[in-house]
Each structure stands twice: as structure tokens, then as C-alpha cells.
Amino acid sequence: WGMFGAADSEGNAREDVRKEAWKKYEAIWTQIAERYGEYGDHLIFESANEELSDFVGGDNLGLNTKYEGVQGNLTNDEAYEVTNRINQKFVEIVRNSSDKLFCENNKYRQLLIAGFATDLDKTCDERFKMPTDTVAENGQTKLSVSIHYYSPYGWGILEDKTNADYQGSWGSQEDYDYLHSQFDKLKKFSDNGYGIIIGEYGFGNTDKKGIPAYVKEVMTYGKKIGATPVLWNNSVFDRYDGVICFKDFAQMLEEVTGATNVPLE
């Protein structure tokens, strides 16, 4: 990904490498769009994952390795600009494929636009811009912003209890207020007609207290602001047997969704 901002050892832009990055990105998405063009609305394309960030201009031109000894040197502002250009190119590639045989569905397909690092605060930064749908009649209705939510870090990511930032429980008024204040920032997208997909959220590990309350609040408050949250499975669901591993979690799902007889281990 850092090929988009490649520079030589003296800080001069390596335009040959940068052009190659665009060429590769366009080739990848052209193939994907045409290969799956006849699939229906259950298939959503996403422009990237967490890589649209400082990765597009940092020292690592892949994820962890340099590209032929070259390193990137984009500023943070420039990384935002490149991210916005990549997302716009993504929309154009998919929409332009709709005139190919069996690809008509790509004209109206829902597209997921990767936020900056898929980080909530960085995506709500004014430098991040949603792309323009090149099918004018779609307006904003076929574009959704993609973010991941693991905040606060001590709760969402950390598993080591010896870490000073580890948060082993969730449910205080402060916890609720923080989640609400964060999610309220996302309304800038839903208020302007865009969808919001919280493509990942989680809680470190299942030893923590208050997990059902946390997941419930993400789901219910997320719905209020027009977001669809997708839980990262931190061992609450047994994929082999298709059952929920914790009774209180299953009860919470029944309460929130109205489902009955949620399969329990």
C-alpha cells in the first residue's frame, strides 16, 4: 500500500512506483467487479481494509517490508488525499464495469468506503471525504462508510491484565457516555444520506466483565445513529457447533433481536 507514496532516499517522489500502485489497484478491482458482477445485492464491495491510512505513505510499502529499498514519505495530510483518491477510483472502477456483460448489478451495488485507518476519529476528521457516486441517480444511497470500533483501547484490544491500560470491565456511566459521544460523531455520515457499517468491534477477551451490556449498547445505540455493527467473534460463538458459548450473551441477543431459542452451548 505504501507504493502509493513511494519516494527515494532523498525524499523525491518515485512516480514510477506510484503509477504502478494505481495500475495494480485498478487491475485488481476491475477483475473483482467483472468476476462477481452478476451477484445480487447480498454482495457488497469494500475499497480496502485498514490499510488506507498512513500506510499509503509510510516506511513500509507492503505492510511490513520496504519495496525494492524504497520508502514512502507522505505527510498525514497527503495520506488523507491519497486515501480519498483511492476511494474515488474504487467507485469509478466498479460503476464503469456495469456496462460489461452480466455486470449490470454493479451500477447500483452497495459500496463500502474504507474510512481512514477505519478509525472512528480519523474518519470523522474533516480531511476524510466520501467519494462521489458516478451514477448520479444513486446519490449517497449506495455508499456506506466503513469503520472499526475497539475503543477504549484497554477494553477493546488489550488482553494482558498486567498492562496499566487494561480495562477489565464495562458498564459505568462514563463508559456509556464515552460510547455515545463517539458514535454521535458518525451522524455526520448518516445525516447526509450515507450508510455506516461498523465492520468490526470487540472487547479483547471473554474474561472481561460487562460484555453483554457493551455489545447491547453498540447494537442499540448504533441503530439510533443509523449504523450497522458487526461483532468480531472473540470466542463468544462456537463456529463448529453453531452455538453461543455464554448464557448471558445469548439472553442479551434474544432481548435485543426478539429472537427465541438462540442456540446455547
Which residue ranges define each predicted feature?
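Mature, structured extracellular domains of secreted fungal proteins
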Residues: 9-14, 18, 28, 38, ...
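Generic hydrophobic, helix-prone segments enriched in Leu/Val/Ile
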Residues: 14, 18-25, 117, 128, ...
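Flexible, glycine- and charge-enriched loops at secondary-structure boundaries
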Residues: 15-22, 76, 80, 169-179, ...
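Active-site region of glycoside hydrolase catalytic domains
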Residues: 19-161, 167, 184-203, 224-225
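Short secondary-structure transition/capping segments
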Residues: 46-52, 156-171, 229, 234-248
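Substrate-binding cleft of secreted/luminal carbohydrate-active enzymes
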Residues: 173-264
